[in-house]
Amino acid sequence: MKLFVGLGNPGARYAGNRHNIGYMAVEAIAADHGFGPWRARFQGLTSEGRLGSEQVLLLKPETFMNLSGQSVGEAMRFYKLTPADVIVFHDELDLAPGKLRLKQGGGHAGHNGLRSIHAHVGEAYGRVRLGIGHPGHKDAVAPYVLSDFAKADQDWLADLLRGISDGAEALARGDGAKFQNAVALRMQPPKPEKPKPAAKAPEAQAPEAAPDERSALQKLADRFR
């Protein structure tokens, strides 16, 4: 079994926040791949289903961001999962809006949700870092991540979530390259080929004159008629 965790804060007040893009990612997977209804478990909401041959549990911790590790740890203990079975979707200030990167293990870079997960299960789990951009000054970070995505963000956000859903099966089986390619195809679809110019029709040639079969004497006589 794989555990896909989407980080965010519970409640309608936070639903459209940049900080909740992790929630949005697992919700898109659940909706597009026929997962079961969301149920209250492990201090969060869970939905079960399959991605290809892999059984997958989607988890949205409802502990609020700073205590996300409590929920993740509880689910892992129940299913006897290791950090290698876990992938966390989270917002990333250090990536431009719409950019996505995979990461296995490593630090939490000050992200409070990841910090909590580190404290409960260690750092060896996988992450899908979802770029939301940086407001430019550290004092502006909290209000920025707790604000809704702007109208101008909606198109790339929709494409990003579709791409994540498209590539979810590849991600579940460990094919990170194919997952990232699925996202890239949504974010930067191939340009349509330019129509080739129509081939010019060959110019009509004037019909050849019939050969003159008159004798030299006839030609001379015709000149003086």
UniProtKB/Swiss-Prot annotation:
Alphabetically, the GO molecular function entries are: peptidyl-tRNA hydrolase activity; tRNA binding
Low complexity: compositionally biased ranges: 198-209
Q: What EC designation does it have? A: 3.1.1.29
Residue ranges, annotated region (Disordered) = 184-225
Stored InterPro entries = Pept_tRNA_hydro, Pept_tRNA_hydro_CS, Pept_tRNA_hydro_sf
Q: Which UniProt keywords apply?
A: Cytoplasm, Hydrolase, RNA-binding, tRNA-binding
Residues annotated as coiled-coil are none
Catalytic activity from the UniProt record: an N-acyl-L-alpha-aminoacyl-tRNA + H2O = an N-acyl-L-amino acid + a tRNA + H(+)
The residues the record assigns to binding tRNA are Y14, F64, N66, N112
Q: State the source organism's domain of life.
A: Bacteria
What does UniProt give as GO cellular component? cytoplasm
User: Subcellular localization, per the record?
Assistant: Cytoplasm
Q: Which SUPFAM superfamilies match?
A: Peptidyl-tRNA hydrolase-like
Site for Stabilizes the basic form of H active site to accept a proton, residues: D91
Q: Which GO terms describe its biological process?
A: protein quality control for misfolded or incompletely synthesized proteins; rescue of stalled ribosome
Give the annotated active site: H19 (proton acceptor)
Q: Which is an annotated Pfam family here? A: Pept_tRNA_hydro
- Its biological function? Hydrolyzes ribosome-free peptidyl-tRNAs (with 1 or more amino acids incorporated), which drop off the ribosome during protein synthesis, or as a result of ribosome stalling.
**Subunit structure of this chain's protein:** Monomer.
Give the record's family classification.
Belongs to the PTH family.
Protein name in the entry: Peptidyl-tRNA hydrolase
Q: Which gene encodes it?
A: pth
